[in-house]
């Protein structure tokens, strides 16, 4: 199994495209991470919108550059709104199947959504393996599997759905079912702040709206988040000071490619 690495030039090119196109991302995400997700997108140069009412969601999904479906705080009314948005979306959409391996209702819902052909799927190893039908597991939103162990499941899921599948962990793996790109970096402190994975899913959604190689663009999203995490940790004393430094680091990365 060959795992390629993303070059700095590829990442910088994707970030230049990101700034140039400034995607409008319709984030149907969970209640815990909305502010952090919106600020992450803004720091990189995208425009977030959090529209959740069923009638409005289906209307707005057709306007946005990209759509994110994150099932972290799923309810039946929210599931109806998400389904309506996916059905009306004429743009790329990304699925974040939070805790899909641990809870039956959201697993059934996410499997139903797969028939609408997501452009990308982003999850930890346990979530991707569960969604692929390989195993059930995970401790709530936390993974109990190493990212590398989920590569075969990610490849299968990508081939079956046509999506770019992202498995996040100490090393992130991005695959279209054939090619695999590995992204190293980041820091364990990133796992001590709620929402870094969910925010990444929003950035992945935005990258799916960019022109060019979608796999490379999505892999670049992982690279930016890991880079920003490393920079933020170097300036932080713990999780509380990490968040503002992380947002600053994303902003600085975006400014650097414009210089």
From Swiss-Prot:
Coiled coil: none
EC number: 2.7.1.50
SUPFAM superfamilies: Ribokinase-like
Keyword set, alphabetical order: ATP-binding, Kinase, Magnesium, Metal-binding, Nucleotide-binding, Thiamine biosynthesis, Transferase
Entry keyword Metal-binding: yes
Name of the protein: Hydroxyethylthiazole kinase
Family: Belongs to the Thz kinase family.
């Amino acid at each position: 199994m060959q795992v390629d690495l993303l070059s700095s030039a590829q990442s910088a090119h994707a970030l230049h495209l990101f700034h140039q196109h400034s995607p409008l991302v319709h984030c149907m995400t969970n209640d815990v991470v909305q502010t952090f997700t919106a600020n992450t997108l803004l720091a990189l140069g995208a425009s977030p919108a959090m529209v959740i009412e069923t009638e409005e969601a289906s209307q707005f999904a057709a306007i946005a550059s990209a759509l994110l479906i994150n099932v972290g705080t799923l309810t039946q009314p929210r599931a109806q709104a998400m389904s309506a948005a996916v059905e009306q979306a004429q743009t790329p959409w990304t699925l974040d199947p939070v805790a899909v391996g641990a809870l039956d209702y959201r697993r059934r819902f996410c499997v139903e959504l797969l028939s609408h052909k997501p452009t990308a799927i982003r999850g930890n190893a346990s979530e991707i393996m569960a969604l692929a039908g390989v195993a059930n597991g995970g401790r709530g939103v936390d993974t109990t599997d190493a990212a590398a162990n989920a590569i075969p499941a990610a490849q299968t899921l990508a081939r079956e759905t046509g999506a770019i599948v992202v498995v996040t962990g100490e090393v992130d793996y991005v695959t279209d079912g054939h090619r695999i790109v590995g992204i190293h970096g980041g820091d364990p402190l990133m796992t001590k702040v709620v929402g870094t994975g969910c925010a990444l899913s929003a950035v992945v959604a935005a990258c799916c709206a960019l022109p060019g190689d979608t796999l490379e663009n999505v892999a670049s999203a992982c690279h930016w988040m890991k880079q920003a995490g490393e920079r933020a940790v170097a300036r932080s004393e713990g999780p509380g000071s990490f968040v503002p430094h992380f947002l600053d680091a994303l902003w600085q990365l975006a400014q650097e490619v414009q210089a």
